[in-house]
Every structure is written in C-alpha cells, then in structure tokens.
C-alpha cells in the first residue's frame, strides 16, 4: 500500500494541519503522518509520544479505516532524493 508522507512536529495539531492532510485524503490517497522526534523546548512542549497519542485520538476513524497511519520518525536535518525515485514531490 502506498502513502502520501507528511513530516512535521504537529505541535499542537490545528486546522491548518487538518486541511493539509485532507487535500490528499480528498484525492483518495492514504496518508502517513510522521512525527519528528524533537527535543522538548519552548516551541515543542509535547513529547513525540504525546503528539502521537493526541493524533491517534483525533484521527481515530481514519486510522481504523486504514487511510491514515501515524508514526514517530527520528529527527531529520534534510530530505534527499534521487531522480526517478517513483514518487511525486508536492508542496502545499
């Protein structure tokens, strides 16, 4: 199964995040929400586990239907890809 990948901190989850995810869901695409495992600070008051729990509750029906997956991802410093990798790069 293929997924549209979204990487973020999601601190806190808000309507802008929902709109972003909904764009792909409306196209019939599955979505994988990756929570960056960032260190707690003023901008990141919630642990990745707390964010995952919050998203799992808010998106319970979509997760249960298999349309959305939520995972914790190690913190990243860049996204790198080669030519012809078999997926689209989409900016919203």
Regions flagged by a language model, labelled:
Residues 1-92:
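Nucleotidyltransferase catalytic core that binds NTPs
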